[in-house]
Amino acid sequence: MAITAGTNLNSVAAPQKQTLSSNYVDFTSSSTEGWAQQYLPELMEKEAEVFGPRTISGFLNQVGAEEAMTSDRVIWSEQSRLHISLRGTIDLDGNVSSSGAKGKFTVTTDIDGNDADDGFTLASHGVRNHDICLLSTPGYVSRVMVVAVDGTAIGVRAYDEDVLTNHSETAGAATLLVIGSEYKKGDNYDGSATHEANEPKFKTFTNKPIIMKDYYEVSGSDAGRIGWIEVSSEGGASGYLWYLKAEADTRARFTDYLEMAMLESEPGSNSTNVDGELGLSPEGDAGTEGLFYAIENRGNVTTGVTGVNAATDLAEFDAILAEFDKQGAIEENMMFVNRSTSLAIDDMLASMNSHGAGGTSYGVFDNSEDMALNLGFSGFRRGSYDFYKSDFRYLNDKATRGGVNATAGSEALRGVIIPAGSSSVYDQTVGAAVRRPFLHVRYRASQTDDRRMKTWVTGSVGAATSALDVMQIHMLSERCLVTQGANNFMLMK
């Protein structure tokens, strides 16, 4: 019988059912120290766990929650900004609707750069007559009053004309911020278009679950075979039955897949070929929005804090804080980073620590220098923010994202910053405002079927369900990730 040569490390499942030399112990090989001889060797039955804890699941359990859903799609909405702030251009000689304005501000986007997205439209910018605004261009800030509004054109007059004339029309985009209003005595709203009420805007997002499956099979004969190696698994299975290890590894790998898919997935585009493979219609309905995709498209991305030196890393970290200030300013945040980024942050913090020579800190054994030296930091405060740092095994392990990062270059992921706590959103499925963690998993469930993590056994081994002389273990899950308030997240690349 021909035996296909396998790898030295039997750590990856074979892509197809085949006999590999790495599945067996060769009793005649010199590496087995002469098992063909008549003397009994000293047998170490316990399988060595050379890769430590191999599973990476648990990240979403730390930072999120799980909740059932009954639909093919989950829809949620998020608050828009409270205050009216716009980007645009300024024409110092412009007039609007013959109002006698001494300047015209033309709206191009809202303060976040949206021109027709996230509930904002140029025609509904919200600026009204008699609003007092701050008008800024590079080097100058003026206080102006709105005297006319015609679509995206806003006519203004300055409280100090001398300052207004200093603005440069070619200096780039201008910013207009409403700070209040002023009316004369006895003045009243007249219900015209220039005095209509402002309705709050909201942003609506959606995601859909994906169906994930895996499978393990062992024949009735092999299920009863006793091996000489004592095996154990992350799931707690142990003994001398090899199929117990194989089944437990399949289950542990599938559990990791449930989390890895929620981190890495992306929704299909209208031109994707995956739709045809899955038989989906309309096009673009394949895939689901994972965490990293959501942050890249709706959140923040930084390339800073790379360990160049402590001073540079600190300046780059402060830039992250400045970006958080522009967003929700969530006080407590959790950092999940790879090893190099974790060490860079430790070095950055150690450089600012005045305790101990060279900025070292004796953080264990009652801070005794003679007992232990702690050069790592798990939590720190900078500005008004608290950060809790943790190593992210998924980004370090060579068999997961760590191996991908080694060849990904500038697209390598070094970590993610996630806000702690919960957010208030309107759930259109529930029909009410609810508070949920910023991250939570939605899984399909009903009174008939719970598809959070569904397993069942078929065959004639054990509980007989068919005439097949096998034990077939099936695993299935249908789930998606809801990333609320992605503007408060930061991806480190």
Positions of PLM-derived features:
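Flexible, glycine/threonine- and acidic-rich loop/arm segments that mediate assembly and lattice contacts
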Residues: 1-371, 391-399, 418-493
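Short, flexible coil/turn micro-motifs enriched in small/turn-prone residues
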Residues: 371-374, 410
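Catalytic core segments in nucleotide and nucleic-acid processing enzymes
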Residues: 381-399, 404
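Short, surface-exposed amphipathic charged segments that create phosphate/polyanion-binding patches used
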Residues: 410-411, 415-416
